[in-house]
Regions:
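Conserved Rossmann-fold NAD(P)-dependent oxidoreductase catalytic core, especially the SDR/UDP-sugar
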Residues: 88-130
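Mid/C-terminal beta-alpha module of Rossmann-like enzyme folds, strongest
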Residues: 190-252, 257, 263, 289-291
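Amphipathic terminal alpha-helices
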Residues: 257-263, 270-293
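Catalytic helix-loop patch of NAD(P)-dependent Rossmann-fold dehydrogenases
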Residues: 80, 115-154
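Glycine/proline-rich active-site loop of Rossmann-fold NAD(P)-dependent oxidoreductases
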Residues: 140, 152-155, 167-177, 194-205, ...
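N-terminal Rossmann NAD(P)H-binding glycine-rich loop of SDR-like oxidoreductase domains
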Residues: 3-23
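Rossmann-fold cofactor-recognition segment
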Residues: 31-45
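NAD(P)H-binding glycine-rich loop region in Rossmannoid oxidoreductase-like domains
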Residues: 43-81, 92
């Protein structure tokens, strides 16, 4: 089976490329030259896409403008890259005989729906988004385009909405692994599971770390998060104490990835212990915690 990964020079695209390359014939495409970019160029370039799609069975589309690009690129750029290029890629894939399309999206698109007043938000795939930025709006629009394409052309499309997945200070990353964060390696594995599960139709899943919290914890997490953490994750509380870090008194949301775990057979394994281990190993995947003066 041959798989095309767009955005293959990025953190997530590269992680997916490396995860798949031992079992699949993988080709990558990115605007940046890289060891995992077999095709180099603009995701909007139709002729480049057509060349890259030769003999491709599965498309994994990670290429996009992201939140850090807001204010640096025009709204038109966001629309042409995140929406129009996504639609074009799917349609050209259908012409080329692609059998499956996997779209890497984001939990950020839920916007203010993630943070209701007075309690932590419990966010699953049934929540109606309330976008706040052009990034959110274009990701929502891209998902809508893909759903319409899936229905019209009978192309199996799986959307994977990943939570926070970038280097942050270790205390923040460790906390978020239980509520709103994910390791790039677990994201890559989710894409592998989506390929192998071969779900029909259009499907959407939140990809985030396993949470020990439940819906009934939403109000306590917002008002007394430190007490909830001590009760639910004593090992994390102990690690914070040993390292001289303070537990937060409030958390504003929890992303629930239960549906992905159940329907894709996906099981994230890189929890807060992985964050601490990477910190101790001086990995570039996690930032040190700076002591306040």
């Amino acid at each position: 089976m041959k798989v095309l990964i767009t955005g293959s020079a990025g953190r997530v695209g590269r992680a997916i490329y490396i995860k798949l390359m031992s079992n699949y014939n993988v080709v990558g495409m990115d605007k940046a030259p890289c060891s995992t970019a077999d095709f180099v160029g603009d995701i909007r370039d139709q002729h480049l896409i057509q060349r890259a799609l030769q003999d491709i069975d599965v498309i994994i589309h990670t290429a996009a403008l992201h939140a850090p690009h807001v204010g640096l690129h025009s709204d038109d750029d966001f629309y042409t890259i995140n929406v129009e290029a996504t639609e074009q890629l799917a349609l050209l894939g259908i012409e080329a005989g692609v059998k499956q399309f996997i779209f890497t999206s984001t939990t950020a698109l839920y916007g203010s729906a993630s943070t209701p007043l007075g309690q932590a938000g419990w966010v699953n795939e049934d929540i109606i988004p309330k976008p706040k930025s052009i990034y959110h709006k274009t990701k929502i629009a891209a998902e809508a385009k893909l759903e319409a394409i899936s229905v019209k052309h009978k192309l199996p499309i799986t959307v994977l909405q990943m939570s926070r997945c970038f280097p942050e200070p270790a205390d923040t990353m460790a906390l978020f692994r239980n509520s709103r964060g994910i390791d790039a390696r677990d994201v890559a594995n989710a894409h592998l599971c989506a390929i192998e599960k071969k779900l029909s139709g259009f499907n959407r899943f939140i990809i985030s770390g396993v949470t020990p919290y439940s819906k009934k914890d939403c109000q306590p997490l917002y008002k007394q998060a430190d007490k909830v953490i001590i009760e639910k994750i004593p090992a994390l509380a102990d690690a914070f104490k040993e390292r001289g870090w303070l537990l937060p008194t409030s958390l504003d949301r929890v992303y629930d990835s239960t549906r992905a775990q159940q329907q894709l057979g996906w099981h994230p394994k890189h929890d807060f212990n992985s964050v601490l281990a990477m910190l101790d190993d001086e990995s570039a995947e996690v930032l040190p915690v700076l002591k306040s003066n």
